[in-house]
Amino acid sequence: VYTMSKRINPSVNAISTLVVLLITITLTIVNVLPMIRKKTSPSKQNKPWKWAVAGVVVVGLVASLFGLNKSAGSQPYAGQTLHVYNWGEYTGENIISGFEELTGAKVIMDNFDSNEQMYIKVANGDAYDVLVPSDYMIQRMMQEKMLQKLEPETRKECLGELVDAIKGLPYDPKNEYSIPYFWGTVGIVYDKTKVSEEDLEKDGWDIFLDQKFKGDIYLYDSERDSFMMALKALGYSMNTTSQDELNDAYNWLIQCVQTMDPEIVTDEIIDNMAQARKALGLIYSGDAAYVMSENENMGFYMPKSGTNLWSDAMVIPKNAKNPKLANEFIRYITSYDAAMDNSSYVGYTSPNKEVTEELGGKGGDYDGINAYTPRAGYDKDEVFQYDETTRKIIADLWSRVKVAASNAH
């Protein structure tokens, strides 16, 4: 259960001052005023009026203390602001309002479209308290000393909530800098009325070269994901730095775009596959889960040659203005209620083990939808590793693939 850490707040001093002041007033009323009344109205001095007045004062004291303590204790960050930089449409509908109500802080959330866009903005000095980059970008930012370590309390509390498969991934082996926000895999979304499981088992990633599906496939406009697919189809590591292996993957993709007439898309694949506009496509597991929930004829397959196990995680940049509140936010997001809101609304897999089991289990929102629960512990699945030289090579080769695709029409 998430409980906001208790910290000394300046308003405690105000409470102490109020206690002293009101007790002094009460004693004055009870002890001084009767002497005045004795001089002016001796016949009434034995009436219990002074206890009534004292009672009113005491009630007022208790009410004042309760109200002030409630405000100070339950909203220790009142008046503060948290700046978050996250992907678009990646937050549950009650996440922000829930955290603001709990802490009294105001949350300002900006959105980015790519890890590279986020990196450039932060590298240029824009200050955020919480970022939600992908695994390989977190590794890069750690290498460049752009992040600060999490509080020990945050690390301990959050790790206790996480699915084992998402703990200690290679980019941050001890989770000293990051706590997962969502996770998943990359796979093939397919129309079960057009594509058989036998085809998928036989071809794996090479199904994107099967002439039976020419003109009926989507590729995803991402050099990392497209080269991952090609490298895995060829039996290579997706983290290879071999120029020969990268060239082989390039030729595989060239063959695909020149012979298969694919449509290269981004998020359009979600609605298009939900409407069964093509037979199959390269997709993130969370998007596939949505497609399958919208269309019962859709399936999701992860080839046996392996795929990418990815994670987007929360980190705190070195130049964060409110790291204490940032740690509070990270603990909040990992808690059951917030994680449930996030995952049930967005559709991506929660790192919170209880939420994942509930949503993906019997009677859950994603019961029977295998895309919601990523394959874990498979030795041929990999997490992306950051290598600047390889990144530049792949970016250049992917640009050539897209030119070839345009010329093929």
Annotate the PLM regions:
Residues 1-28, 32:
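Interhelical loop and adjacent transmembrane-helix boundary motif
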Residues 36-81, 406-409:
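Short, low-complexity disordered leader/linker segments with a strong preference
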Residues 67-68, 73-144, 271:
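Early extracytoplasmic/lumenal segment of secretory-pathway proteins
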Residues 127, 132-277:
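Extracytoplasmic ligand-binding site segments that recognize negatively charged/polar headgroups
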Residues 137-140, 274, 280-297:
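A ligand-binding cleft/hinge motif common to bilobed small-molecule-binding domains
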Residues 247-256, 294-318:
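Periplasmic-binding protein-like
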Residues 312, 317-378:
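Mature extracytoplasmic/periplasmic domains
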Residues 374-409:
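Conserved C-terminal helix/tail region of periplasmic/extracytoplasmic solute-binding proteins
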